[in-house]
Amino acid sequence: RSQWTIGRKDGFSSLDLGELESECRISFDVVFKEESKNFYVFLNSDKDNENAYYIGIDLVMKRMTFDRWPRKRNDYPFMLELERYIEVLPNVKYHLDIIRDNSVLEVYFDNKYAMSARMNDFKEGTFGFAETFGEAVIESLEYMALER
């Protein structure tokens, strides 16, 4: 499938795309609609999205974040050291590249911003997209297992 639209104006919407391999690359384009507030890529999620890592694109605060749920300490909306300010606007196509090498995660937003993180606790699960109080269109999704 070449395009997915996810979102709800009144809450949370998600799309699970299947098992995430321990060494892989996820590449896609995304357009955030005018009312979009938060877009997420979830990684190593359980079937209910109750335990997962999240790459977040916050259109209100203009930042890319990395988080896990449930959180270990404090109740910050993301891991404080894993926040990158980004230029992001609605109705513009952006490209994301996500590379996973076991516990190492590299995220590239629109070939301008990068973020590195570790995923030490949740070793396996699914991946997909989520949107809150808005709508996003995902296009040109490529998923590749990486071989050594």
Feature annotation, model-predicted:
Residues 1-148:
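Extracellular glycan-recognition regions
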